Amino acid sequence: MLVHAAERPPASDRRRPHAILRAIVIPYFELPSLHLGPFTLQAFGLFAALGVYAAARIAAREASRRGLDPRPLSDFALWGVASGVVFGHLVHLFLYHPEELSDWRRALSFWEGLSSFGGLLGGVVAAVVFFRRRTIRFANYADALALGVAPGWGIARVGCFVIHDHPGVRTSFPLAVEFPASAARTLGFSGARHDLGLYDALALFSFAVVLLVLDRRGLLRGRLLAILALMYGTSRFLFDFLRASDVPYADARYLGLTPAQYFCFGLWAYGAWQLKKKEEA
């Protein structure tokens, strides 16, 4: 059926819903650095430190609730952070931005360029070494670790959000960040875009609530870390399809997937294996 021009809504009316959505996106902002004498603390570093502290404190508290000695988790925190930074930087260099390997100074600058999954890999390696050397059964502490890691990682991801480190594709979604036109000169892109740091943080905080509810109701005991692996692996795999490829510092892709998406297969395998092992026990 033909629609006459007189029956069509005015162009301004047709554009109004889109304009409303654009009006409610998150405005671009930057948090200033914190200067402490000769030291400068960047916003990301502050949230990363808070995340590590929160994860360690919550995990230790949960271990105590279970009648376990919390000191191994407090001692492990330093191991986990050190190994996480090293592996996080190496994964960033070798998988995300291998072009930077041509400059040996970048390879040694461990504080510049970190992959969250590389950090996770470093934490896993540190956990294997630490718990074996201490002859402590890791499974006893797995639930406590899950309850600490989820909110702690979420806080660290807020650090990614406040520096807008992971821009996504353009969108009019209400949780998008509106990068101003002036950002094109400094960042190389502008417009309303998904911000994957925010999405990751919201997902992890949600997972923390789910795990806490399961724990307090006595459900899936001994399986919370596996549940976290399955939930985060799924959310991260889906979120990474929203990552921008039209920005100057875009993540590398391999057969259409980011390195993190391949790591998600490892999380799924670990989660499924742990759940199956618990069922057979």
Regions found by a protein language model. Name each.
Residues R8-P10:
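Short linear/disordered segments characteristic of secreted peptide precursors
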